[in-house]
Amino acid sequence: MEEEIIKKIDMLSLKMIEDIKTIVKMPSVEGTFQQGAPFGKDIALTLDKVLEIAQSLGFETKNLDHYIGYAQYGKGEDYIGIIGHLDVVPTGLGWKHLPFSAYEEDGYIYSRGILDNKGPIMTCLYALYAIKELNIKLHKPVRIIFGCDEETGFKDLEYYLKHEKPPVMGWTPDCKYPVVYAERGRAVIEISAKEKQVDEFFLFINNYFLNANTNAEKLGLDFKDEEFGINEMRNFVLKHEKSKLVFSVTFSYPANMTLETIVETIREKAKNMEVTCVQHYFPVKFEKDCPMVSLLSKAYEKITHLDGTPVTTTGGTYAKLMPHIVPFGPSFPGQKGIGHQPNEWMKIEDLNTNAKIYALGIYYLGML
């Protein structure tokens, strides 16, 4: 059956690429809240178009008030969930071609969102379409879930989980290969002081953050483990708010640390200053040899003939909030620094390869 699935993806390739181009041409940057469009009209229109395409492929669809939507194949309570996102970051400067043009050259497509994340989630839709067209009867239904707020806060997924039960297994195609079995925790910490404390405040920030190693060694927070690596500080932001000075820092931390350790350690050193956590996600970890991870590794190795040993990531995906899913693709080893950048790209060959990997992933998980 694997070979039939692979051949079906090849047959669907041209149609898939055209639909991907249609979606990446839509400028789905977050806009102003409107009635019926919580993340702005452009994202709402993009979700409408994706669900229209899914309906044309014969899927049942559901739009959850333009927060998020999904296409489903099969019936049942416990389902396999594959979640990506349609919202994109602003385009910025430095593009060779119009950033929403889906410009094709030498086997590459250049466009904001082609990698992060419209292209990959559309390959998942077509992977499921191949399964449906082959009339493969899976043991569980499968949902392709189209998020609309991954870049700015996960409010889409929060809304989804208030109205729908989570999947029993699945993935998000918004990271890298091979399958990612663990994500670091993430904590955004704010340190604030009154204006009259300006000298003390900047001395502290310079000493422990701006003129320090990013592993938080000066703070005594240079925790590390074999799987996750060392703690990392990133995303420094300095603000002046209502007679207060505020410094924000994000900790990407390994599983042998806790949020309490981070906050209390900084509080001990930042005397007379306020230290608060404004956002936090716990580390996510699955066993490397659990059935879901093992079968996704098998799908990756079957198509690419590369080593599928599961890996960890310092990044953050929907897996932080959506239970029972792992990051899986779309970037192959060596492909870095593409998303969020000018001239964001993806090879057409890689889009097709992703669709094949994802189709086998659906097939393997669906037959459990």
Give the predicted meaning of each segment:
Residues 8-15, 19-26, 49-57, 130, ...:
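Generic non-transmembrane alpha-helical segments
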Residues 86-88, 145-152, 174-177, 332:
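Acidic, glycine-rich active-site loops and adjacent beta-strand->loop/helix elements
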Residues 150-151, 155-264:
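Midchain, well-structured core segments that form catalytic/ion-binding scaffolds
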Residues 234-239, 247-255, 274-293, 313-316:
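A short beta-alpha structural unit
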